[in-house]
Regions:
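N-terminal targeting signals for export/organelle localization
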Residues: 2-72, 230-232
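Short loop/turn microsegments at loop-to-beta-strand junctions
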Residues: 70-71, 93, 192-194
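Short active-site neighborhood of thiol/selenol oxidoreductases, capturing the structured segment around
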Residues: 83-113, 129
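Thiol-based oxidoreductase modules, predominantly thioredoxin-like and allied folds used
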Residues: 125-139, 155-165
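Short, internal strand/loop/helix patches
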Residues: 144-192
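Thiol-/selenol-based redox modules, centered on thioredoxin-like
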Residues: 181-232
Length: 232
């Protein structure tokens, strides 16, 4: 079983390619440990903090572990409609953070996420969710134009905006990646270059380098594995 540890944020600044190596090494060790302790089905580990809760079963109190989940949220998509966590019910999905005028890692990230979109396009069990961290500039119209430029005209890949504080909050405290203002960074913000894989129960099952082909190859392989798991 996985040890009771909080998922360390993957910290990638808006400078290609400055990474918090200690965080990456810790995460790799954590994943290696949990994978090694997984069951014979070789399921992906559930990442994040676990909380012990007491409940009554057959008249007896037992202690159970509750895994970290992505909570509900309320954002607006490139189509102008409200998007909540319910839109992702019974889906596995990949989440990331970006902004349309990003001068550094975002173009690499979107090139790689487009590969994921193309591979799983039309699969009703898969969605992609990209959060802008510059909502003042990235209006619904801007996001729609950006999505169209990538060849995205359906609802399988949603680009969402909302109050800046809500986006930063869900990034740092729910997906546990960096998303914040930083006037010393290009564009005035700093965010993670990670892609976060979330299962149908809203658990985080993997964190991947979204700026490299190798990282995204691993993501897509794990998505296939997670789809098989959810169908078994």
């Amino acid at each position: 079983m996985m040890s009771n540890q909080k998922l360390t944020p993957v910290f990638i600044r808006q400078k290609p390619f400055l990474v918090n190596l200690n965080a990456w090494l810790f995460l790799l060790l954590l994943v290696a440990f949990t994978t090694g302790c997984s069951n014979k089905d070789d399921k992906l580990p559930i990442l994040g903090q676990r909380e012990a809760v007491t409940k009554t079963v057959d008249g007896k109190e037992v202690v159970d572990s509750v895994y970290h989940r992505i909570p509900d949220f309320k954002f607006v998509s490139q189509y102008g409609d409200t998007v909540t966590a319910r839109a992702l019910d019974n889906k596995i999905y990949v989440a990331d953070f970006f902004f349309t005028t990003c001068p550094t890692i975002c173009p690499k990230m979107k090139t790689q996420l487009k590969r994921v979109y193309d591979k799983f396009k039309g699969n009703p069990d898969v969605m992609l969710l990209s959060h802008t961290i510059d909502p003042e500039h990235d209006s619904v119209a801007v996001l729609k134009e950006f999505a169209t430029g990538l060849g995205v005209t359906d609802r399988q890949w949603l680009f969402v905006t909302g109050p800046r504080e809500d986006i930063y909050e869900i990034g740092q405290n729910s997906y546990m990646v960096t998303a914040q203002e930083d006037q010393s960074a290009p564009g005035g913000v700093v965010h993670s270059g990670a892609f976060i894989l979330v299962d149908k129960e809203k658990h985080i099952r993997g964190v991947y380098d979204g700026t490299t082909e190798e990282g995204v190859n691993k993501l897509m392989a794990d998505m296939d594995k997670l789809l098989r798991e959810s169908q078994s």
